[in-house]
Amino acid sequence: MQLPPLSAESRFRPAVYGLIHALVDAACVAAVVRASRGSYLGDLSTFWTVAGYDLLAFGLEFPLGLVVDRLHLTRFSMIIGTAMAAVVLAPGPIPALATMIVAGVGNGLFHLGAGGLVLRSAGGRAAPAGVFVAPGALGLGLGMWMGRTGRGATFPIYFALAFAVIALITLDKPALKWEPSKGSHALPRSGSGGQSPPAPTRSLEPPKGSQEKLALLPWLVLLMLLLVSVAVRSFVGFGACFQCPGGLAVAIGLPVAAFLGKLLGGMMADRLGWLRASTGALLLSLPLIAFSGGSLVLALPGVLLFQSTMAVTLVAVYGLMPRWPATAFGLPCLALVAGSFPTFFPAGKQLFGRWTFVLLIAFSAAALALALCRLARHGLARDRRFMGRRTGGARATPG
């Protein structure tokens, strides 16, 4: 079964949100790094300010996502998050702690709102999610450069974000039609729900009622496989960056490689099949990352391949909970910060090593492959999204 074609609006919207995503990330990171370097509150250091920002921006996305979905606030969350990103760049002194909190919460709210709307409008495809998340890597790189060097004017980003807030309020009202209808927030029900565009043919959301409790176990197992795969990739990704030497080439090369990987990964997965493209990319990245030895010639292609699986993972998690798009976007973000947390400390960095990376990448690929195969067996592979062109829908779905 072929997926229906996306409307022009559904193709255009992820790109617009992706551009705002880059601006939001650049603003938040630049403001946090600059504030931490130039203003201290007690023993608040640059390290803890940036770490606190990461924990707020990514760690809170799961609980905030539950609230956003429950109250149907995806569009509101996106607008408020964009406005908060503009606030941290507003003229005038802002304490480092306040900057960290406003930037972290604002960044998370934008991710949940815009990411949830993109997932809901993607029609079961991975490419729109990749188009949305990819520019964030460029924004992160730009924000780190601006924050560390103190160079680059923040006024253009501030005014661009202010304009984006006005545009989202006045011009983006069609996004309201993607909000779930009343009563569709009940997580233990199946189906695509609400007024969302075409979604996976079946949902693996945990069932409702004591007589169906056994079905909760495979749902949780699939979800944990996807999230553990993300957490492991987060740890290895930080390790790959840690091994690279400093300098302008790394500051530019790593964000560009991550951008291209996320952008092209979703497109290639939709074309070649999610399982084939995602696990293949991870396995191809294994020798490049594990044995790069800090060489950018090997590390950058490895990072590109490594990052190409994020879009598939996001849409696969959404396939498990299609009535909860913001939560589905927030859970992988929580896994990202969980995987990166050990790298905040010297003891965690001691785990970096080529054979550790070999084992972890292989484990991540196996977890992702197992999850995608099980999703296919449960009716989410009646087209070419999961297994590719050779294993089309009817054979991939049990009769």
Where do the PLM segments sit?
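Pair of pore-lining "gating" transmembrane helices in MFS-fold secondary transporters
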Residues: 2-38, 47, 212-236
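Central cavity-lining transmembrane alpha-helices of secondary-active solute carriers
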Residues: 47-68, 252-264
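Conserved MFS/SLC helix-loop-helix module at the cytosolic interface between two early adjacent transmembrane helices
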Residues: 59-91
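Cytoplasmic membrane-interface "Motif A"-like loop-to-helix N-cap segments
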Residues: 69-81, 270-283
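Intracellular juxtamembrane helix-capping segments at the cytosolic ends
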Residues: 108-123, 307-322
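Glycine-rich segments within core transmembrane alpha-helices of 12-TM secondary carriers
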Residues: 125-147, 329-346
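Symmetry-related core transmembrane helices of the 12-TM Major Facilitator Superfamily/SLC fold
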Residues: 154-173, 355-374
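C-terminal transmembrane helical hairpin of 12-TM major facilitator-type secondary transporters
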Residues: 276-313
